[in-house]
Amino acid sequence: MKAMHYTLEQLNQASADAFVAALSGIFEHSPWVAEAAALQRPFANIDTLHHTMSKAVETAGEAKQLALINAHPELAGKAAVRGELTAESTREQSGAGLNQCTQEEFDRLQALNRAYREKFGFPFILAVRGYDRHGIIANFEARLNNSRADEMRASLDQIYRIARFRLDELIDA
């Protein structure tokens, strides 16, 4: 099924409910981000919309930020195996070849997912566009050496990158 596309003008003029529904997939399972942005319309460009949505997350407090981080699936994780990813996550993970892992790569990703979640208490997040499986695994391994505070920051920054990619796919410039 082809994803809907909108113009910024359509989103600016939409009801708050329609705006939130259109942007509900931008920040994984977190419509509250779109709800906050709806109050700031109109937007002159996608950059401003993205900044406003990201700022809503930045100012939300750690509990909401952690909930947003935890709303993201593990890379090549259980949700992917069970076919429970959102359409956006499925496209992104497939685009990086995570649906074509060898058994060895899959086992390595599963071990990294467990180690990362055990150390930090949330899933590893990476905007996978532009990465192949080997690059994802290398990034995963390197980030396991970070502090929890550094990984919270890295996770949010990656979420903002994912959101920008999703906005660019959804909105016709």
Label each residue range with its predicted role.
Residues 1-3:
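Short, Lys/Arg-enriched N-terminal segments with co-localized hydrophobic residues
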Residues 5-13, 25-27, 33-112, 161-173:
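Aromatic-anchored, charged helix-turn/loop surface patch used as a conserved interaction hotspot
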Residues 19:
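Surface-exposed, charge/polar-rich loops and edge strands
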Residues 101-173:
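C-terminal non-catalytic interaction appendages of large macromolecular assemblies
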